[in-house]
C-alpha cells in the first residue's frame, strides 16, 4: 500500500540511504537519481579536500575563517580567545631530522590541540603555524595555557622543541577573523627573539606600537619616493 511504501522509504532514509526508488522502476529516473547521488558524493569529497588539511586533519585556514565567523555570529554574547602557535626554526628541524620527523611534529601538535578543544576550532594556519579559537574557559586560562605549553614541550617527538604562542583574549567581534588572528600573530612576533618567554598576550599598547611602526615605514617609503633623503659624508682626519 501507499502507507507501507512511505514507511519503507522513511526507514531506508533513517538507516542512511541516500535515496529511495519505489517500484515500478523507471530506468531514466533511476539513472538520474544515481547520477545525482554520485555528484553529491563528489561535491562532498571536494569540499572535504578544501576544508581539511591533508597532513594534520585540522581545518584549513579558509575553512577556519568561515567556521569561526559563524561561531561568533551564532554566540555573539560569548567571550572568545584566539591562540596562534608558531614552531620555531621548522625549516632547520626538517633539515636536521628529516621531513618525516617534521611531519610527525605537526601531527603531534594537531593531536594535542584537537584534544584540548571541546567546543572550539583548531586549524593549520600556515606551514608551521596553528590557530585555536574557543570560548574563554571559566578557570584560570593563563595557568591552563602554561601547563599545556609545558606538556607539549616535555612530550614532543624531539627534544628542545620550541613553540611560540600569541594570544588575543576577549576578541573584538566587530573586526574580521583575519584581523583577530593578526593581533594574535602580532603578540607572538613580539617574543620571537626572546628565548626566556614562550607566551605573549595582545593588548592595546602592542597595537599602538604596531601602528607607529607601520606609520614610520610608510613615512620612510614616501621620503624615498620623494627623494627627501640627503647623503652627507664626514671627512676623516688623522
Task: Go through each PLM region and give its residues.
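Signal-transducing coiled-coil linker helices
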Residues: 7-54, 61-72
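Generic recognition of well-ordered alpha-helical segments
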Residues: 32, 66, 108-111, 147-150, ...
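Conserved long alpha-helical elements within nucleotide-processing catalytic cores of c-di-GMP signaling
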Residues: 51-52, 57-81, 88-115, 123-132, ...
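Active-site core of bacterial EAL-family cyclic-dinucleotide phosphodiesterase domains
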Residues: 67, 212-238
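GGDEF/GGEEF active-site signature
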Residues: 82, 107-172, 176
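Cyclic nucleotide signaling catalytic output domains
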Residues: 164-194, 200-215, 219, 223
Amino acid at each position: 500500500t501507499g502507507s507501507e511504501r512511505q514507511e519503507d522509504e522513511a526507514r531506508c532514509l533513517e538507516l542512511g540511504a541516500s535515496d529511495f526508488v519505489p517500484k515500478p522502476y523507471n530506468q531514466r529516473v533511476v539513472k538520474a537519481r544515481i547520477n545525482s547521488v554520485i555528484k553529491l558524493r563528489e561535491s562532498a569529497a571536494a569540499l572535504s579536500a578544501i576544508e581539511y588539511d591533508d597532513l594534520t586533519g585540522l581545518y584549513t585556514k579558509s575553512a577556519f575563517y568561515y567556521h569561526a565567523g559563524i561561531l561568533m555570529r551564532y554566540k555573539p554574547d560569548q567571550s572568545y580567545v584566539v591562540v596562534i602557535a608558531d614552531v620555531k626554526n621548522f625549516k632547520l628541524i626538517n633539515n636536521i631530522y628529516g621531513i618525516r620527523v617534521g611531519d610527525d611534529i605537526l601531527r603531534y601538535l594537531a593531536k594535542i590541540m584537537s584534544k584540548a578543544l571541546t567546543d572550539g576550532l583548531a586549524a593549520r594556519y600556515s606551514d608551521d603555524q596553528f590557530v585555536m579559537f574557543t570560548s574563554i574557559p571559566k578557570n584560570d586560562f593563563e595557568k591552563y595555557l602554561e601547563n599545556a605549553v609545558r606538556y607539549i614541550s616535555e612530550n614532543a617527538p624531539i627534544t628542545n622543541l620550541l613553540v611560540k604562542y600569541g594570544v588575543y583574549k576577549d576578541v573584538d567581534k566587530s573586526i574580521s577573523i583575519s584581523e583577530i588572528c593578526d593581533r594574535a600573530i602580532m603578540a607572538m612576533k613580539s617574543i620571537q627573539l626572546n628565548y626566556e618567554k614562550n607566551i605573549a598576550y595582545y593588548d592595546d599598547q602592542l597595537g599602538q606600537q604596531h601602528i607607529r611602526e607601520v606609520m614610520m615605514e610608510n613615512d620612510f617609503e614616501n621620503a624615498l619616493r620623494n627623494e627627501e633623503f640627503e647623503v652627507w659624508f664626514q671627512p676623516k682626519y688623522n
